[in-house]
Every structure is written in C-alpha cells, then in structure tokens.
Amino acid sequence: MQKWASHLCAPQVPLSLWIRSSGPPILLGLYCGFAATLPTGPFHVPSVRASVSGREGVSGRSVASSSVTGQPVIIPSAYSPHFHVVSVKPHAVTSSAPPCISLYWYRHRVGIEAPRTAEPRAVTAIGWAYAAVASRDTEVWVRRSTLLDIIILPLPHHVPVLSPALARLVRLFVLRHSNQFLLVISSLRGWSGGSIPLEYLATPLVVPKIDPTDDGPSEPPVEPPAEASTTHRVPGTIVTALRLLCLGRAPLPVLFRETRHEPQRSSGGGDQEDFSWLNAWPASAFDYQKGVRPFRYVTDGYNPGSSVKKELSQYHFCTVVGPRKQTLSLSSPPGLSIPDDNSDKSVNLSLLPTTHKEPPPCREWIRTGGRKESDSNNDSMNRTEAPREGYSLVKVVDSNNGLYDHGESVPAEIHDPSISNGSRGRIVGFRSTRLSTRRKSGRRTASNSFRNSPGAPVEEGRNTGNHHREHPLLFVDATRRNSYSSLVTRVLRTHDMIRLLCIIIEHKQTFRWILNVVNDLLSVGSSDNSDDAYAADGANDAATGGGDDTDDDADDDANAAGYIRSMKVRNVEYAVNERTGNLRVLKRPVLQPDYRRNLIAGLMRARRRKTLVWESLQSRTHSPLFLRMIGNSAPPQFSPGINAKAILTPHRSAAEEEDNKAKPVFRRSAKMATAKRIAAAKRWDFTTAHLTRGCSPIAQLYLRRNVILPTLTIFRNICYLIMFQKGEWGEDWNELNKEVYVGRSYDGNAAEVAKGLPRRWYRNGLQIKIVNPFYLKHRRHFVYGQSEPDDGTGINSTGTRNGMSKSISSYETNSYGNSSSAGGGMGFGHSTVLGCLAESPLGDRIKRPSFWKPLLMELGRVWWGNVPWIRKTHIENLPSRPAGKDPSPVGKADGLDAGTGKSIGDRVAGTRPGECGAHSAKVGGGISDLSIEFMPERDCPLAVSDQSEYRARMSTGELGCLVARGNDGASRVTGEFAGAGKAIAPFGPTGQDRGYTGGSGTAAPILIHRIVVRARGRCLRLLRVSTCFVQIPFSGFHGAAAPICRFLPVWFNIRLITRSTRRYVSKVRRARDLLAGRGGGDSIGVYSSRRDVRVISQAYVLSRAWRLSAVNKFRPADPEYGRGNPGARKSTAHLGVGGQGILGKRPLRALGGRYEWARDPRRYNVPSGIWCRIAPRGRKMKDEYPRMKDRELNKKQSMTLDEAICLRGIDPEPAAGVERSRKIDRQYGSNPPSKSSPDVVPDSSEIRGFAKPWRMGRGIIPNDRTRKHRERIVSGGGWDRPENRMNERKNLPFGSNIHSWLYIDIPERFHILEMPEFVATRYLGLACELNVSTASGYVCAGRGSARARVETEFREDRIEGRWDLGSKQVTVRARKMRDATNVPHAVFIGSNIEYPREGSVESTCESMSRDMAPPPYHAAPPDSTNGMLDGNRGHRATGVDKRFLKHKMLSVLPNFQNRFRGILDFIAYYEKSVPPRTGILEDGGDKTICPHSSHIGDVPLPKRRAGSRILESFYLAEGRSRGARSEGGTVEGHERRDEEPPVQNRNAEENETQTINSILRPGHRPEDPSRMNRPRFCTNNGSQFAAARVRIYPSAGIFMT
C-alpha cells in the first residue's frame, strides 16, 4: 500500500481564488443533477422497464428512491481519495467489476426462477415479475433486491462515466484551461459515451428470453429487445467494461487545501515526517507515461543518515540548467504554464501565507516580487515532451527583480548539447541564471536572512537539527519558495548547495571563512558528520581545482549520502570587473557530458531506465549545431562594466571563438539577424541535412588528400625542372604526410578521421579540422628579387622602405589561424563544404598570396634569356613583360613602396621636395637616359602591409594615371634627352626597374601596333556595361567597373581582353611617344589627336575614380594615405609648340601651401571622352574650351553660376554683410577646410549688387566660402574687352569655385522621401543619373551652346517660385518625414525609471524641419504642434524661395533614409559622474527616449563617402608650419598668413589628428563633440565644409540628467 500511495504525492495545482471557492460546489451540483435526473447506468433498466410497461406494484417512487439511494455511494467514491484510489486503480477495478456484473446477472436469474415456481403464469422478467406477484412477502423481497443492486453496481460505474475515451479528445482542443472546467466536459462526454452503451449492452443480459411453453397470464408476453444467449453476453459485457476502465483516467475536481510550510508531525511524535499525500490531489495517478519512467528512491525526512527511502516517480523530475551544471529538479505541476517572460510565473506566490505570523523578511519579499497569478496549462504537456515541441528560451527579466546589479553581473551562457532548447528554458528552482554579487567584494556574513529573523519560531530545548527540521524553508532560497510539500522542499535543497559552490569559486580569497558556514549548513539535523565531510571536501576540491577523483568514488559517496550526484566544478574561466575588481566565474561547455551525473543515487535499475529515456530524448532534441546558431547572448567582454582586456580566458578552440563574436550594435538589426538565423537553423535542423552537410567535407577531404595536393605537387616540381632547377619532391611529400585530419562534432567529440568519425556525427554535425595544412610555397628567393610587371602605377609590392626585397613568404607565414612564425609551429585550418580552408568552421576563407604568378614569371625570365625565339614572341604577343634589373642605370629613385619595413618617423624614403630623380628606359635593346621630374609627395603613397590595401591603391593609381595620359589616345610627352636638359613626362617609371626591353626602335611595327590598339578598343566598346552612375566603356576603366558588371560572361570577356592587351598596349604607347619625342628635336611639344581637353580638379577625379573602382570597399587606416597619391600628377600637356604648358612649372610644395594646392582646380588635362563620363551635368555645361596660354588669363576659362547671372545683363552691386563674410573668410583661412562651416546668406532683397530679376524673385544664392578679390567676366561684346569686366567687392557671399561644381537639376517637388539617395552629399551631380550622350554634346558644342544651355536651365527652373511653409501639404509631408526618421519616437520608456522629470526634447527630424527655414527667421521655438511648420509667430517667414529651400534641405538631410535608422544610443544604467546620453520626451502623456546628441554628425557615414577621405589625404603631405608661403603664391595668401594669429595655427595643428580621425572613422568621438564628428561635404576644388549641425532645441522643458 505504501508503494502505490507514494505515487500520489504531488504538488498542489495552483488555482485562482474564485475557482477554489466556487468551483467545487458548482461542479458537485452538476454531477448530482446528472446522477439524479438522467439514467446513469444499467441498474435503472429493470425499474424503467417496469414503469413503462405499466405493471402494478412498481410505481415512480421506486425509480426515484433507487436514484436517490445510489447518490451517497457515487459521491464519496468520486470525491474521497480513498474510494477514488480503490475504484480507479486498474488492479482494483479489474477485480471488482467482473464479480459485480456476475452477481447482478445471477441474482436476477435466480429471482426470475423463484416467482415462476410459485406463479407459473407470471411474467418472469425483473420488473414485470415484481408487479405480477400478489404476495406481500414477494414484493418486499423484490424491493430489497433492487436496493441492493443500486448500492453494489455504482462502485465501478463512475469511472467510465466521468472519463471515457471520448474525454481524451476534448483535452486536445481545450488547452490551457482549468482542470475543473475540463471535468464538466469530461462528465458530459462520459455520460454519453459510457452510460448509454452500457445500458443497451446490459439490457439483453438482464432480460433473458421467456419460454413460450410456460404458463402465463392471458395477456401476450412482451418480447425481449434482443435475442442472444446468456453465455455470449456475459463475456462481452466484461470486456467492454474493462476497456472503458483502462481508457479513462482523468483528474477529478477536489477542494484543495493549502498545506502549511511546517512539516506535519506524525502522531507518534517521531522525527520522521508523515507523508501528506492526502492533502493534495493525486495528479500523478493519471500519468499515462509513468510506465516508461523509472522511479527515484529519495530519503523520506530530513535525517540524512536515515535509511528509509521512498519511491517517487520520475514524473516529478526534470532536467534543468543551474548556474554551474545541469541537474535534476522537481518539475512544475501539470497545471502550471510554461514560463514565458518571467520565471516568477513558475512560482505560485499567491499561495504563500501573508499572515503576521510569517517573518518580516518573508513579507518584504512578497511585497517586492508582487502577487502574480500562475497560468494554467494542459497537464498532458510535461517535461519529457518539451524537447519534441521546441519551446523557446525563457527571457529572464533581471532588471525588475534587482538581480542585474547595474552592469556588474555577467551572464553565464551554457552551451550543453545534452538537453534541448525547450528543456533549458523550463527553470523551476531559479529566478535567474545570472551570477550577481554586490558592489563590494569584502567579507560578508553568509547566513540566511530567515534564520535570524524575529518572527522565526524557535522552541526552547531543541537542538539545531530539530529547529531545521521544524522550519525547513528557512534554509531554502526565497526565490524558490512555493507551496510544495516538505518532500519537494527537501529535494530542492540540493540547488542551494550548487549555488553556494558558485559563490565560493567567485571569492577564493574568503574560501576558508565560508567553508565553516558550508559545514554548518550541511550539518543541519544530523549528528553524523560523514555527509558534512563529503560535502566540505567536494566544495574544497571545486574551489581549489583539485577535485579529480574518479567517478566510481563519487558514485560510492553519493550512494552513501543519498544525495543527487554533484558535478565537479571545472571548465570554468574568470572575468574581472574593471570598476569593482570583482572576480566572476563563467561556465564553459562540457565537451563530453555524462548522463550519470544527473541521476539520483539509487539502484542500477534507475540508471538503466535513465539511459533508455536519455537515448530516446536525444533523438528528439535539437542538434548542437542548432543550439550554437540560435545562441544570441553577447560575450562577457561586451557586457557593461567589464573590461575585455581583463578577462582571463584559457586556450579555446576555433569553434568556441566563433560563438564569441560581437553582435550587431543596433537592436533592430540584431533582432532581424537573430530571427533569420533561428529560422534557417530550424529549417535545416534534421538528420538528412546534417548527414549531407557532413558528407561534403569528408568527400572534399579525400579529394584533397589523394587528388588535388599530389597533382599540384607534381606540376610544381615539373615547372622547376623546366626552369633547369632542382625539384623539391622530398620536402613536398614530407609536408604532405604531416597533415592530420580530425573530425569534430559540434558537441565537442573529436576523433581522427583515419581511425573513425565521431559518434553520432550525422546528427550532431561534422567539421573537419586540418592540422599542419599543406600549401604550395616557395622555398627559394629567386622569384622575389624580380619586380612585378609594370602596371603604370610605380608600385613595388615586394619592396620595403629601405629598398630591400621582401619575400612573399612573410605573407604565408601566418596564413592559418594559430600558425607560429618562429618555425615549427603547428598551424590548422577547417575544411569548408566547398573544400576551401577557413580559419574557423563558420569563418572566412583563408587567403594567401598567389603561388603560380611569380613561378610563371620566373619561368618566362629563364626561357627569355635562353631561347631566342621566345624573346621575339614575347615582344609582340606575350601579355606580361618580365624584365630584370637594369645592369647599368644612370640614375635611381625610390619606387612606390608597398613593404612593411620600418623607417624613421613613419615616412616614405624618397627625395626631398624639389629634387628630381633620373630614370632609364631601354628601347630597342639600347639604353637611353630620360630624366623625369618626380615629386615624391605626390608620387609615393605610404607603404602598406596588407595585400588588399596594396591592390586597392594600385587600382586607384591606375585610374589616376589613366586620366593623366588619356583614354586610348597617346600620352603627351615633352622631354629632352640626356645631356640636353630636363624633360617632363606625364607618367614616368618610379621603381628601381622600369626598363623596357626589346623593341626594334623603328617605325615599321608602330603601324601594326596601332592596328592592334584600335582593334582592342573596338572590342571593348562592344562590351560596354552600365554601372550605378554612368555608362563607362571599358577601354580604360576596366578595373573600375568590373566588380559591378551585370553579367558574368561580359565580365569574363572584358577581363580577358584587358589583361591580355594592357601590358602590350602600354609598352607600345611608351615606345611610340619616346620615338616621336626623340626625332622632334629640343623641346618639341607633341600634339594630341584630341585637343578638346578640360581642366578638372584632382580631388574630383580621385573621388570619382574611388567611387567607381574597387576602392569603395577599402577604408585607409592611415590618414596620411594620400600624401603621395599617384593620381596627384602635374599637368604636362602643351597646346602649342614651345612653352611650358598650361600651368607652367608647378611651384615647390612648401610646408604651408598644401591648402592652396588642394583648392586649386587645375590639375589634369582630361580628354573630352573621359570628361563627358565623369563630370557632373552642371559642370559640363559651363566649362569652356581652354584656349588661353597665359596662366593668369587661364583663371577665367570657366563660366560659373555667378557669371551666368551676370550674363543676363545686370551689374551686381555690393552686397550686405561684407564684414561678416570677411571674418568668416579669415577664420576659414586659418583653419583646415574640413573645419569650416557654411554660412547662410540673408534674403537677396537686402543684398546690393545682384541682378534685378533675382531681387524681384527673392532668389537667394547659396553661400560658399569664397576667396578674396576675384575678377569676373561679363557678357556683351567679347570676353577680353575691359569694359565688360567688373571688379566685385571682396568677400562676396558667392563665388565660382564651388557653384560650378554644385549645380544640379533639383526636383521641383518638396517630397524628400521620393528624392534619389545621395552617394556623396555635396557631389550633387549624382542625385540624378547622367545622360552621357547629351552631356558630351554640350561640351563639344562650344562656348555659345553652353551659354544657351545655362539660360535654358534657368528658364526651366524658375527661381521666382515660392513655397508656402504654412500650407497643409508641406505640413503633412514634413510630418511624414519626421515619422520616417524619428527612430526614438517609437521607443517606450517603462515604469522602471525612477523620478522622471517632466519636460520635452525636440526630436531630430523636428529640428531638421525647422532648420530648413532660413536661420534669421527660426529664432522662435516650435509650438505645441511638435515642431511642425504650420504656424507663424512673427519670427519665421511663411514663405521662402524654393531654390534656397532645396539647397538647405540637401545640406541638412543628406541621405537621411539610410542614416537615421539607428541613431538611438540608449544606455540604461549610468553613474552619476557620467552624464546620460538620453533624454525623455513627454508629449501628451507619451514618453519617448531621444538622445541629446541626436544630430547628423553622430550617424556613421555610408561606405561610399570617400570624397572626404581623399581630400583629407592631401593635408598631411605638407609639414606643420602653415606660415611658409609656396613659390608663386598669391597676394591673398600673404594677407591671410599675416592676419591669422599664431595661436589659431597651433590649435589647428593640435586638433588636426582628431579632425582627420573624425572623418576617416566616423565612430571616433574626441573630447569636443561639438566640433568633431560632423559630416564633411567636399567640393571639387579641393576644399570642404560641414553641414549645419542639427541640434536639439529644448522647448520649455528640462533635460533629464
């Protein structure tokens, strides 16, 4: 009896108060009504049939009395646990049901025969026989027999009535409802499914067939309803009853009674605790899976030395994750719901008593946590079904319960593949999985707060053990208190020991002091100290790391103690808090988890059953790879308050490092990425997918080992033999044999592939790790001494800064993750699905320098010198041009360096400013000296160490050189031969070896070369592709637009043609130009076939090339990148015979002249073919054909926007605000261009000197930081007439250098959301796609056409139009813009922020919408309309010129659709010393978070914003002294130098690094955020200016600090 009674010990099902009070009476009434008014079973059949037949003797009173008499038997059997157990248990029902049915049948059979003997003519049926008997004694006997039938038969009857098989179907549809409500449906289904079938099945049994030969009354007898033999009916009835009894077992309603927290003492007064299983409803009795679950034998009572153990079903246990390990814990009752948002829902706080007898700490805890009602859940969903259902993780909210100690706690993330995601989330005994301590790490009293509380009852004369047994919950964590029985509480005490061990490890320095407290805690209630010693030794081993006992010893100790087996604390790492210095313990995943550690010490039968259950659960759990993919907790080094450098982590595998990568910064992007990752993981988390994915690395492994590597080795050594060198067979085979292949599953199991794969690799996922991977490398240094083919950039990828050759093997030394550079180190890699090597299983592919390229170069060099016909073929056909060092160079200059050698001051070793280097070139086999002027600051970029940076800069150099020498036309070379003076070449070789070998030197092959060049150009023109911005023929920009080709075949053909002919054509052009220059005499200028060149800014060309090339993905790490940019070439084109060129000799670059040089727009002579493709539309319309030879007159070669205004025939007058412009100009001259800010010009009506139509139309011209005194050319008569010139006043608020580059057709509509997205804000020509064909026609048409086009543009875009800022349309669109950009508007502040101050903060977009109006009129703060432009208080203009509004909006809202998605930088917890970055916006009761620094400058710039980076590269090319004046400087430069104070120069010099950092790295935040980190808008004349900062203007509110 004790065995099956122990199964009934279950926690109480928590119910609401109204259910507990009103549920049982209502349900009892329903049940009584069913039993009293409806036919409830076959015992009513005789009475009903007698009443219907109308026979005398049996009236309605008999039927009513029989129903009422049966209720006292039915009700106790349904509501009394004792009767219920006897009736429901299968063994009891099986033994009681057949005798009852047999006795019923036999008694009626005997009762029928007896009346037949006395009265032969009487009807021998049950009811009819009673009615036909006239004797008084016979009637009494019949009534007594009927009463006896009613009493006996209802005992087993209520089982099929209440819960038949149909009731199971109801539970599938009615989920998460109260078990009491489910009873009502079960009763209805039970009556219809159990009572009616039994009635009709029992009717033929109890009413046998009457023999017609018997004598009877004169009336005809009533035929029985069925014809069947009695022997066939009895077994059928018994089988039907047995089936219904076994199918229906559902919990019944019961009036719950709250149990006291104090254990109930037995009547004998002994120390053992009574089993209080009758206090709670025995829900475990209906566990339909209990047959497959093992039993746990746990100690009954609090005496650890007691040998009395009781059997508890496995139903009450589940696997949970604690702070340190997985352990068995009591599962929640079947009625509890799965925790979703807070683990407090799994604790029934409402059942805790709140009387004054409870200790004060308990009441305080109840008030803090709050009373939260638990949700009900379907009891069919238990713990063993959780892995199969795939529940999500529990989101524990620690900020509400105070466990998250303001950034000092570290989340302990455990990746253990032993259990699934759903089981991990079902934590019952813990409110949080985080380890949290107080701020101070000093000694604290580790005692329970309830032990010494004033209200804790302590009886005198009792020892400590009795006190602990009397009040067991005083030693359990308060967060784990629930209305469990005392036995449950005893099992939960195991968690306290585990948590205490975690605290011991955190504070090693106080271990000896805490150990005494542990011993005192473990010695509670026991005089035997064997368990204390065991626990103390285990804690000591866990804390000191010395617990290395075997599992057998641990099992013996656990069996002796009767506890849950404890896991040794290992595989931990430590993290140190930077602020407090506290030590944190982090649990790392156990590679090979042992299922036995979760077993209760007991019989081997339990272990065997546990193994079977574990294996069955493992087949339904998620794979370890899935658990890794869905893990989204940030690593501890990214937690608040934790210093990443202070984390002491041991060696980790590559797979573990992959899990600790940083997560996205913005919350929205992080959630989206997590959702996609989890969806993909769930979609591919099945055995077939893992098997397929695992087979691919295995196939790649064998293919690599047996096919690929041997083939490459053989081919490599054959190449060595062809080069007449010794092969390296032995070395290659030895290294190949050193490769070791290790198969690893994602749960940590590893095995060598040669010996077998890991267990269950097809389920857990497989990855192949290659130890000592073999790769082809050069063991000789003959290849590295040679220079690479000339690419026209002067870049030497193998040289160092000291001029020495560098071996490529330095790149290959650390090709793999952990390879050692000291030699002999063990490298490793991971094979991917496609057979490539990666640094980690899910990491990036390992990239190494090319092995075959230098080998083929060496092969060509060797055969070049040995076979004569190879040389001839190479001259004419080979694409590459290998050449050796010049044996007798006349002069050398340091080439473009790409090495990593060290140099003093991190400068490039080269010639000093003003020096010229001499180079030699071989033409036709001879040596000709050609002196080339060479500027190291422009021609030599800084050295880089990364190959990707090297290639990126090489692409930039190629584009710059291409612009310098034209598209497919000949480069212009003006030179003098050696001994005759110096010559200037457009692009000279700068490396040590730039000789050109071969070539006959005659004019005969030139014609053939021209044919080849033309054919190549025609082929490339047929393969044009459209890029994002303009259509570019790939005759020149092959490397720029190849990454963005639309079709792979086109891309392949273009690369094939360009690579095969690029070197060849380049060599032919150089040779032709040199030959032409030699025969022309002294200082002969060579005309170009294309004379329609345009002078453009180098800043614009470089930024344009940067944007169109692969460099858009490259961000230079060094701000001094561009000090020697190869694109910064000096113009050398000549327009006539003789002279020095358009710009003449460029002055020496002094230390202070870099800003003038950066702003100088004349840098390149670009042919119109290229100019039509890269120039903006507005610029192309205003440029003129450069016919001026004089440098001073050349300044007036372009028609600007100002001149276009003057062309309308109105002489401008002096403008107002000149003094203000002078001050700004002085400030601009004393600071770098990147620090300057735009100024807004007042209304044009107040400016004197503008055209009258502009005044009438109230047109406002955007301001642009003009230079001092400029001369303008006006229309009328001729361009050179003095009367058509006018001298403007100094510092007018408009100029020519900027507007000529900013002109654009701006959309007429005020609809920001539909405007094109800007790639670079101030390059406004990119706002609309350019029409190359139309633009090229403008340029080629000449000056008159360009002038007419300007006037046409002004007519089309009338400036007289005005926008009414108070209109409803503007208001609606501005509100739409605000909603689209105001990310903080959607953030809701919870109620957990204490003491919020009332106030409002203007949002980002509201400030921007107000800033679009002219600043002189927006002094008034926004009104209650939340900053909308729908009111006029007299301080803001209701109308504004649309041209100015367009310009202003483009200045304030650059590409806002992409930049205002993640402005919010919310820091929830901060110290008082650090001001908060967030504020509270409260408008009409709504609270939102708005950052104080929410302006455009804080938003990271897009990747393609390369213009500012390029312009900043020009700044540091000069020295630090800005006072020095360059040769040929202007008078304005003298004045500006004299006016600027030296203090400003020093300040600008000190802040130069921060300024450049803010541009190169937008996330950089210097000390002064008001001046730094602002968006720079670069202009094409080399200058920059920042947009007006969008600040937050408080509107009658106070910021929260």
From Swiss-Prot:
Ranges of biased composition (kind: Basic and acidic residues): 355-375
Membrane topology: Multi-pass membrane protein
Keyword Transport: yes
GO cellular component: chloroplast inner membrane
Keyword Aminoacyl-tRNA synthetase: no
InterPro entries, sorted: TIC214 (IPR008896)
GO biological process, one term: protein transport
Transmembrane regions: 25-45, 68-88, 147-167, 181-201
Segments of skewed composition (Acidic residues): 548-558
Low complexity composition-biased segments: 1230-1244
Keyword terms: Chloroplast, Membrane, Plastid, Plastid inner membrane, Protein transport, Transmembrane, Transmembrane helix, Transport
Region (Disordered): 209-231, 351-388, 411-470, 535-558, 787-806, 879-916, 1216-1244, 1521-1574
Amino acid composition bias (Polar residues), ranges on this chain: 794-806
Location within or outside the cell: Plastid, Chloroplast inner membrane
Subunit structure: Part of the Tic complex.
Family: Belongs to the TIC214 family.
Biological function: Involved in protein precursor import into chloroplasts. May be part of an intermediate translocation complex acting as a protein-conducting channel at the inner envelope.
Name under which the protein is recorded: Protein TIC 214
Lineage: Eukaryota, Viridiplantae, Streptophyta, Embryophyta, Tracheophyta
